[in-house]
Amino acid sequence: MAHPKRRQSKTRTAKRRTHDKAVAPTLAICPNCGEWHVYHTVCGACGYYRGKLAIEKEAAV
């Protein structure tokens, strides 16, 4: 396997890692139930997506 000829400096390593940060998910409020959910996904609380029922949720007994 290939090996580096020279050691990378701390500055060069840090510059490469500037893009490795975690990105917070974009959230939206569900117009059906008012809960927060991730964009372009089914609401976990009510099961609606874009105004239509996508997943039938069981009622809590």
From Swiss-Prot:
GO terms for cellular component: cytosolic large ribosomal subunit. Residues 1-20 are annotated as: Disordered. GO terms for biological process: translation. It comes from the Bacteria. Residues 1-19 have a biased composition (Basic residues). One of its GO terms (molecular function) is structural constituent of ribosome. Coiled coil: none annotated. Transmembrane segments: none annotated. The keyword Oxidoreductase does not apply. The keyword Magnesium does not apply. Pfam families: Ribosomal_L32p. Keywords: Ribonucleoprotein, Ribosomal protein. Belongs to the bacterial ribosomal protein bL32 family. This is Large ribosomal subunit protein bL32. It comes from Bacteroides thetaiotaomicron (strain ATCC 29148 / DSM 2079 / JCM 5827 / CCUG 10774 / NCTC 10582 / VPI-5482 / E50). The gene is rpmF.
